[in-house]
Structure formats: C-alpha cells, structure tokens
Design a protein with these regions (language model features):
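Intrinsically disordered, low-complexity regulatory segments enriched in Ser/Thr/Pro
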Residues: 47-84
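Negatively charged, low-complexity tracts enriched in Asp/Glu with abundant Ser/Thr
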Residues: 1-45, 70-74, 81, 96-104
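Generic detector of bulky aromatic hydrophobic side chains
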Residues: 59, 94-96
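Short, compact, well-ordered microdomains
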Residues: 85-92
Length: 104
C-alpha cells in the first residue's frame, strides 16, 4: 500500500477508455470558488459521478449522487481493483451504500 502513482491512474484509464465513456482531466471544481488541480478519472452513470485519483500513494475512489447530497469513497488497492470497481460502476453492478454528506 502507499505505492500508487499517477502512472497507475493512467494505467486504469488505458484499460477502460475504449470500453466506457470516461475522461481524464487535470482539475475538479470543488464549488463556485475553488478548484483542485491534479490528474483524475471521471465517469458519470445512472445519476451518479465517480472520481478516481491518487493521493498520498493510495487510490481514492469517490462516488456522489447527482444532487451531491449522498456519497461514499473507498481505496482500491491496485490497478486491477480500481479498473474492476469502475467497470462495475459503469455496468450498474455496484453494491456500495451512499451516505448523507454533512451540511457545510
């Protein structure tokens, strides 16, 4: 653990880009005033958005509903696990539970 790199993120993208409508980007809007600038993979399906990125040598996979009031996240342990989680998300086979986001 803690040996995931941005190259691993691009490896996940390379495995899935021809199968699913996913994108790689270098920034994410947090709200009306802030953005985060780092490579991340983004996917939209069945009213939810998925983000996969590398943070501190670990994969982080976030899923949020369309209203941005419910979500969850987890840490795939490797490229294979991340690719499998995203494929399941895109095919509607995910079984994770969404939790309320705290009010800001």
């Amino acid at each position: 653990m803690f040996d995931i790199t941005v190259d691993d993120l691009y490896a996940v993208y390379g495995r899935l880009k021809d199968r699913y409508p996913i994108i790689m980007t270098n920034s994410m809007a947090e709200d009306e005033h802030f953005t985060e600038d780092f490579p991340l993979l983004v996917a939209h399906h069945h009213g939810q958005t998925l983000w996969l990125y590398e943070y501190g040598g670990d994969f982080v996979l976030d899923v949020m509903d369309e209203a941005e009031t419910m979500g969850t996240h987890w840490h795939p342990i490797d490229v294979d696990g991340a690719a499998m989680d995203i494929a399941e998300f895109m095919e509607g086979r995910s079984d994770y539970e969404l939790f309320p986001f705290p009010e800001q």
